[in-house]
């Protein structure tokens, strides 16, 4: 065994312990209570992890009894319905899982019938360059223009059209969370609200949440809200601005579950994004924030110059926000999917409904 949690086989290839369910999986979860939010979170995270390992199995040519991914879904009585393959590099970026129901495993009415899960960036193997390309598209608000997302949304639409939308889950981590969020938003615009489990979703903005001085942090947020709301109000007759506001309102009934670690700068801004709304309400400026939260300053400025701006992926009206307050060892620990199936976490959850 290698010193950094790697297992070396006889051929000399290495396997991370985190890929092996019997070492790193949620072994405490011997029976799933589908009404328990912690169980639902752990299963969703495990299925996302299985997508990571499906791709690693492909890269390492692990097949049959050598494959490490199946235990991650078999443990919870799922079967692999179909992997989702990127057309650019043939990597596995997602998967559709189907819950099996037997006499020994009667499916609860709260259990998902199908879970569509998406992995994040893998820094090993031949999928890295394509994953980084998709990460850049997130920053540029262009994920919806990629062929990978087109494959993803077609898979979601297929499952909903074929099996109905009841008890269909979306799940994803990091880049995969962005993919699941965008798919969920697209479906919500058509009136289909899917249960969504979004782990460490990227929030592309200045990392204000990392400012330690609370007065400075709140002051920056208030100033940003006033400027954004002012621009939106000044451009209220602009078609693009009005369409953005209407789209935001149409999403307000969708309540995705967001799982955030405050030590993860990629996603931690969601904490301030939602808390700031309540703070603005408390000081009597809720109307300003309700207008500001629908828009980004960059998008408004592009609209003012007569340029097309795409809807920022990270702007969502409502969410069930869960923050992991447990101490993270480092950034890798704070951003990792593995934290979300651990037992004994110090979690804070709050529902934010846009009104």
Q: Which functions belong to the PLM regions below?
A:
Residues 2-45, 49-50, 54-62, 67-70, ...:
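Alpha/beta hydrolase fold serine-hydrolase catalytic domain that processes acyl esters and thioesters
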Residues 76-88:
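N-terminal cap/lid segment of alpha/beta-hydrolase-fold proteins
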Residues 172-176, 180:
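Gly/Ala-rich beta-loop-alpha elbow adjacent to hydrolase catalytic centers
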């Amino acid at each position: 065994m290698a010193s950094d949690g790697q297992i070396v086989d006889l051929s000399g290839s290495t396997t991370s312990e985190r890929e092996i369910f019997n070492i790193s999986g949620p072994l405490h979860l011997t029976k799933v209570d589908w009404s328990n939010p912690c169980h639902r979170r752990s299963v969703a995270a495990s299925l996302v992890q299985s997508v990571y390992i499906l791709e690693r199995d492909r890269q390492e040519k692990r097949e049959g009894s050598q494959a490490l991914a199946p235990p991650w879904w078999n443990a919870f009585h799922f079967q692999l319905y179909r992997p989702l393959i990127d057309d650019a590099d043939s990597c596995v970026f997602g998967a559709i899982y189907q819950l099996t129901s037997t006499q020994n495993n009667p499916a609860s009415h709260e259990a998902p019938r199908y879970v569509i899960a998406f992995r994040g960036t893998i820094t090993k193997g031949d999928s890295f360059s394509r994953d980084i390309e998709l990460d850049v598209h997130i920053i540029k608000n262009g994920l919806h223009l990629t062929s990978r997302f087109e494959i993803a949304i077609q898979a979601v639409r297929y499952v909903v059209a074929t099996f109905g939308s009841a008890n269909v889950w979306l799940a994803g981590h990091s880049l995969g969370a962005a993919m699941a969020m965008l798919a969920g938003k697209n479906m919500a615009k058509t009136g289909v609200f899917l249960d969504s489990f979004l782990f460490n979703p990227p929030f592309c903005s200045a990392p204000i949440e990392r400012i330690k001085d609370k007065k400075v942090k709140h002051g920056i947020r208030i100033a940003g809200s006033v400027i954004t709301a002012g621009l939106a109000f000044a451009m209220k007759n602009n078609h693009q601005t009005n369409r953005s506001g209407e789209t935001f309102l149409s999403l307000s009934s969708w309540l995705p579950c967001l799982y955030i670690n405050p030590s993860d700068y990629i996603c931690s801004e969601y904490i301030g994004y939602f808390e700031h709304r309540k703070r603005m309400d408390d000081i009597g400026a809720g109307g300003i924030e309700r207008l500001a939260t629908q828009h980004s300053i960059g998008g408004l400025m592009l609209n003012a110059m007569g340029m097309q701006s795409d809807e920022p992926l990270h702007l969502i009206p409502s969410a069930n926000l869960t923050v992991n307050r447990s101490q993270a060892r480092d950034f890798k620990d704070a951003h990792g999917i593995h934290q979300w199936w651990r037992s004994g976490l110090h979690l804070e959850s709050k529902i934010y409904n846009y009104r």
